[in-house]
């Protein structure tokens, strides 16, 4: 099912989240902070987090890195700052590294910084992703072939998304109009049920679902091995984690990670073809 969302920051001023909810918005990605003007927390982060939560709108967050985030050390430092801002909060959508400021000439360094950022966030228990434009971001500023383990939020203001890789959210306009928000707002679509994946997986401040808790002392019944198709569906439902965690868990369970991931990629591409023509 396609879900319509928005992404916001202090630029949208004071938002009436109840009106936003009534306008049919089903999720929001909120700016938490950045490093493009020194380390800072977005001035509307707390108000937007509390307002969206109170209105019952599932949320994610993003962190805008500066032009100097072109080393692994810088990526790790930005992630640690992001973690500080997110402490004590629960988010139903991924937490994103926003790569827009780094120059194309620093592509290799930006890629290293991005991997370090994402690994730091993953190690802290977050479902992490990367934001970038379909062309100038993932093609010119980053080596996207090294970033496939992480969720992608792709920006392309057009009637369809031409990005060829796997992505979870498409930002299709910067000139949306939504009741409760003064002026223009970025608009997004997703076909991924991130809230279920994140809550059941115990990411982003949530406790892992009780049914997936392995602390019971009662021996588990022996079950037959699952097919690749069955495993791929479970991966899509968030039952095998994300990134390196997914690979380790599938391998430890005796399954062929490469075969399962190939099936997942095929399913995601099929879903993306549908998403790319949504507007």
What is each residue range found by the language model?
Residues 1-118, 122-126:
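Substrate-binding cleft of extracellular glycoside hydrolase catalytic domains
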Residues 234-247, 255-257:
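Extracytoplasmic Gram-positive cell-surface binding/anchoring modules and repeats
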């Amino acid at each position: 099912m396609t879900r319509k969302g928005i992404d916001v920051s202090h630029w949208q001023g004071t938002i009436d989240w109840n009106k936003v909810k009534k306008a049919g918005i089903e999720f929001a990605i909120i700016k938490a902070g950045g490093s493009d003007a020194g380390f800072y927390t977005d001035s509307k982060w707390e108000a937007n987090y509390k307002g969206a939560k109170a209105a019952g709108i599932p949320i994610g967050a993003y962190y805008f890195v500066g032009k100097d985030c072109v080393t692994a050390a810088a990526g790790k430092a930005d992630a640690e700052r992001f973690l500080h801002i997110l402490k004590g909060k629960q988010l139903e959508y991924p937490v994103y590294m926003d790569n827009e400021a780094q120059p194309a000439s620093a592509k290799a360094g930006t890629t290293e910084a991005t991997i370090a950022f994402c690994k730091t966030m993953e190690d802290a228990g977050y479902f992490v992703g990367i934001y970038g434009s379909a062309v100038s971001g993932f093609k010119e500023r980053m080596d996207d072939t090294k970033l496939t383990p992480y969720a992608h939020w792709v920006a392309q203001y057009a009637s369809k998304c031409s990005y060829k890789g796997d992505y979870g959210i498409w930002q299709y306009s910067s000139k949306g109009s939504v009741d409760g928000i003064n002026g223009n707002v970025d608009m997004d679509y997703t076909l991924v049920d991130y809230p279920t994946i994140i809550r059941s997986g115990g990411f982003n401040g949530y406790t892992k679902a009780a049914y997936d808790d392995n602390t019971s002392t009662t021996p588990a019944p022996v079950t037959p091995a699952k097919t690749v198709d069955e495993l791929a569906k479970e991966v899509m439902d968030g039952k095998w984690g994300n990134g390196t965690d997914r690979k380790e868990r599938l391998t430890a369970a005796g399954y062929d990670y490469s075969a399962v991931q190939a099936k997942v990629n095929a399913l995601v591409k099929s879903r993306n073809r549908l998403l790319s023509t949504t507007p």
